[in-house]
């Protein structure tokens, strides 16, 4: 009996070993190493030395860009994720109503999502150029204000949000699948009871697709917490520094309005060679992502139980 239990235990560990190895190498070890180096003075070249909480004090109190980067990241999480979910659901509902040409419209709305982030951001920056871009030209022709977009601190984050909405095809596809899976009988019964479109959406559509909405929000929050490529490329294109990598570039252009936490990690770790402080920001970013995910799953599961 003991031998059989031991064999079963060995067999279980053997089957789990690929996952355990992957989890240890790609998650547990990097996480613990990041936490370890957040308490060390380390530039990537010399031996690390223990500094206690000095790195944390520097990032939270003396590093001039941390709080601005945190505010920008939270702004993007709240605004960008919310609008992407709303637009993705709205477009999904519109496309599912189309009687003919469904495949064509689905492809048209999904294709922008497949565009490489760097190329898409560069194209958007040129389109929204306040001096030569066609968008401001059209706005001027019809008598509307012409924003500075990526050159204006007040408009840079809304411009990044517009870029994210342009590539909302991924959410459209998953919402379409969820909407098409809602039982038609429920809609027919609601119509017979005299329920209008708003009532059908609130009491039939939304409860049925709530798991997909929760999935879209959670994954959107995690992805936006790691927002890096579009913000830095947009800043470089708008500042005119994209063509020459040797030119001095103002991080977070314009005036720090596009700083995000991942950019701070890059700035500290690879431009200032302050690996310890970069690890502090990485630990904070991980903690925020975990806290936001746990909160959303807890609140979301409450909505699911209620439905």
List each model region and its residues:
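A structural signal for multi-pass alpha-helical bundles of membrane permease subunits
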Residues: 5-307
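Juxtamembrane low-complexity tails/linkers enriched in Ser/Thr-Pro and polybasic
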Residues: 1-2
């Amino acid at each position: 009996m003991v031998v059989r239990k031991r064999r079963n235990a060995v067999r279980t560990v053997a089957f789990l070993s690929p996952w355990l190895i992957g989890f240890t190498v790609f998650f547990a070890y990097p996480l613990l190493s990041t936490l370890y180096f957040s308490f060390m003075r380390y530039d990537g070249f010399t031996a690390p030395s223990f500094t206690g909480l000095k790195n944390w004090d520097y990032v939270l109190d003396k590093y001039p860009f941390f709080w601005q980067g945190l505010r920008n990241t939270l702004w993007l999480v709240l605004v960008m994720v919310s609008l992407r979910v709303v637009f993705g659901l709205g477009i999904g509902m519109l496309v599912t109503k189309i009687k003919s040409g469904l495949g064509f419209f689905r492809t048209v709305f999904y294709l922008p999502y497949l565009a490489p982030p760097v190329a898409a951001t560069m194209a958007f920056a040129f389109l929204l150029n306040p001096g030569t871009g066609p968008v401001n030209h059209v706005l001027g022709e019809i008598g509307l204000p012409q924003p500075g977009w990526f050159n204006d601190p007040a408009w840079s984050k809304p411009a990044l949000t517009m870029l994210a909405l342009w590539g909302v095809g991924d959410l459209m596809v998953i919402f379409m699948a969820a909407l098409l899976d809602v039982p038609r009988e429920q809609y027919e019964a609601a119509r017979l009871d005299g329920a209008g479109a708003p009532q059908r959406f609130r009491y039939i559509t939304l409860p049925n697709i709530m798991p997909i909405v929760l999935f879209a929000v959670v994954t959107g929050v995690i992805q936006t917490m790691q927002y890096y490529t579009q913000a830095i490329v947009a800043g470089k294109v708008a500042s005119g520094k994209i063509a020459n990598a040797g030119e001095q570039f103002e991080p977070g252009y314009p005036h720090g309005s596009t700083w995000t936490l991942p950019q701070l990690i890059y700035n500290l770790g690879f431009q200032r060679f302050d690996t310890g402080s970069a690890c502090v920001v990485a630990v904070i970013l991980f903690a925020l992502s975990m806290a936001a995910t746990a909160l959303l799953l807890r609140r979301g599961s409450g909505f699911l139980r209620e439905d």
